[in-house]
A protein has these predicted regions:
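Hydrophobic transmembrane alpha-helix bundles
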Residues: 210, 218-219
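Short Gly/charged-rich anion-binding patches and loops
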Residues: 168, 208-209
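A conserved hydrophobic secondary-structure block that centers on an alpha-helix together
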Residues: 197-207, 213
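N-terminal accessory/pre-domain segments preceding catalytic cores
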Residues: 1-182, 189-197, 215-217
Length: 219
């Protein structure tokens, strides 16, 4: 139930008690800051610059402007994104690969391995809607290659029944999965693969599993 009530809060008086810092301590702290900056900048310098991105795009038959934003946003994960696009080019799926990348957040671009993206790209009907079916992400879960797993594990008869009537998938999730809210701490979920294997989930993981299964079946 929702409710509200007035609260009158008086914040405590500020009484900061900062320690004295000697000139030598300040100098050492500055040295450490500079060292940290140099390490970070050296790492950033390994990211592909615009000419390298343009050359990569040409090598896979794509327009530089189409891939530059994704590669820049992927930062230290650029090799994985480029590998994904390279594989898509070999299979003639560059346009579809870009549609998939467009569904991802910048954090996903920085975190997701090429193999996970490939699993979703190559195991989804080419005519399926990108935002509602091709997209790997459901909520705030870690992205996994659940699509090929569920397509392989869900019995053919069940898959056919779920496609004919998606409400049967709803009923299966309700009746076949045991709710175990104590399994997940705040902001963690069970992967769709884990839910299938264990037949147990908290409510959010069950919801994610349902969407993952529906997408895997092309619903």
């Amino acid at each position: 139930d929702e409710f509200s009530f007035p609260v009158d809060i008086v914040p405590p008086a500020e009484s900061a008690n900062l320690p004295e810092v000697t000139a030598a301590q300040r100098a050492e702290n500055d040295r450490r800051f500079n060292r940290e900056d140099s390490i970070r900048n050296a790492y950033i310098a390994t990211f592909p610059a615009k000419p390298a991105v343009a050359e990569f795009a040409r090598s896979v038959g794509m327009k530089p402007d189409d891939v530059a934003g994704f590669i820049a946003a992927s930062r230290g994960n650029h090799a994985e994104i480029m590998d994904f696009l390279r594989g898509a080019s070999r299979k003639g799926c560059t346009g579809r690969a870009l549609q998939l990348l467009a569904t991802l957040s910048e954090k996903d671009l920085r975190d997701t391995p090429s193999a996970v993206l490939a699993d979703h790209l190559y195991n989804t009907d080419k005519n399926a809607d990108a935002a509602t079916v091709l997209a790997p992400r459901v909520a705030d879960e870690m992205l996994t290659p659940y699509r090929s797993f569920l397509q392989r594990e869900i019995p053919a008869a069940d898959a056919a029944a779920f496609r004919r009537d998606p409400q049967r998938l709803v009923a299966w999730c309700r009746d076949s999965l045991t709710l175990r809210p104590e399994l997940c701490t705040v902001s963690t979920t069970i992967s769709p693969e884990g839910v299938w294997r264990s037949r147990a989930a908290d409510k959010l993981s069950r919801a994610i599993f349902f969407v993952a299964a529906a997408r895997s079946l092309g619903l």
